[in-house]
Amino acid sequence: MSMGQKKYHQGKSKASRKSKDKGKEKFDLFNYDRRTLEKEMWILDKLVNGREFKTVEDANDFYSQARNSGMVENFHPDKAEDRAQLLVYDAFSKKGAERRNMAIRALEISENCPDAYVILAEMERDNNRKIELYGKGVDTAERILGKEIFDREKGYFWGIIETRPYMRAQEGLAGALWNSGKLDDAQRIYERLLDLNPGDNQGNRYSLLLLYMYRNDFEKAKKLLGQYDEDGADWDYNRALLLYLTSGITMESKSALRKAFESNRYVPLLLLGDVGPLPDSNYITPGEPDEAGSYVKASGSLWLKNLGATKWLVKEFAEYLKGREKTSGEFFRR
């Protein structure tokens, strides 16, 4: 069991772009890093620092003026740590050696740059080194933020842009700890991140649900599933599996599995090896093979290690296909 790095350009938080193909929404996993969108927000936050506005309209007028007058594009911070962070935001849009070198330069400008450690950790192959780098990012962020903010802003943590490097470093650290078999530590971090930010902009709930289920902590898995109103292969198939493992074959578990089939009909085929390997894709498309491949890669072993669940899936899917063939004459008509 291992946990790959999954967010921003690999996973569940799903930075999205609209596809012109059939009105479906596609998610670019590798060629787009949504952290680049923070740059303007971060600059505006720096520009507004210390200013007081009497009304919301006054604040919006300032933001518009800042964007239109070139204040954002020409922002040159005085503080070394701000210059380092600005460089890191540019690094997020780069690839390979250029990205790494920009992160290194940012740390040369200021060691108070958690996101630079995050970039270096993401690009590191050795997992022990990943843990070390993510840990440095966490320690640096905690030192910069101070202790009071964690209690004061609990529940809204992601909404403060200065906290996001901390959240990213902790998220990465949890994944690296999981890969090292330190499941208790990984679980505590994911739970802490959801405690700080229940809205879960990062998508840590997906990792935590998977971890609960791998550890057979079904009560916590059930509670987490109930906290979020989700659609999609991850949530639907894991909900169906959890119902089977805790209650067996019931009307509720059968209904949940049928809902999962409607969410993505390719998951059973991939689980059972009835289709060949999928080509590498830069996208996750809801309901399509790339989403199914992403789910099976992360959660497939949960099904396969439970023979009864797999047999149940086969039986229910066969009946589902027969029903669709009768009503539509085609298995996968949308």
Which sequence ranges carry the predicted segments?
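TPR alpha-solenoid repeat register
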Residues: 116, 169, 203-204, 235, ...
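Extreme N-terminal leader/anchor segments
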Residues: 2-109, 325-334
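TPR/TPR-like (Sel1-like) alpha-helical repeat modules
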Residues: 128-145, 191-200, 213, 223-233, ...
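Flexible helix-coil transition and linker loops at the boundaries of alpha-helical arrays
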Residues: 73-78, 106, 138-163, 194-196
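Structural motif corresponding to the intra-repeat A-B loop/turn of tetratricopeptide repeats
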Residues: 93, 97, 120, 124-127, ...
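Long, ordered, amphipathic alpha-helical scaffolds
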Residues: 66-70, 75-76, 241-334
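Structural signature of alpha-solenoid helical repeat junctions
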Residues: 79-82, 112, 158-165, 182, ...
